[in-house]
């Protein structure tokens, strides 16, 4: 049973990585023809993070609006943990060492998210990643960060330990 669960974890993470790359490419392609003048669409990779919590303000607002309420407090924290890890990855995409650190942070955040909402995980993951990678330059930075660690071996926690990946 443990081997099949571990295999499921590896398969799921593999699908997520492929999904991330494909989504990033789609976002990059679709952004070129966009006529939107939204501030999010014209900002730098860093965007605005007025409260310096490591998450862009537009993403903070989205998380607070989408995952509001006491019942979603743990989910709100898990999504924000992932958003912070992705934002760090984008900002440090040119550094192999930092990309490896941030990739590990992203995996821990995804494990936390899977622990908090196993049935909704994929939908939430795709949704928040779309918010994070909402410009071609952000999508390119995400792909660059992943390219920095494509040969790395990042160990996954056993499923019964995913909740330990959650930051308070």
Segments the model singles out, each with a brief description of its role:
Residues 2-8, 14, 29-52, 58-168:
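Calcium-binding acidic motifs and repeat modules
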Residues 19-23:
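Sec-dependent N-terminal signal peptides
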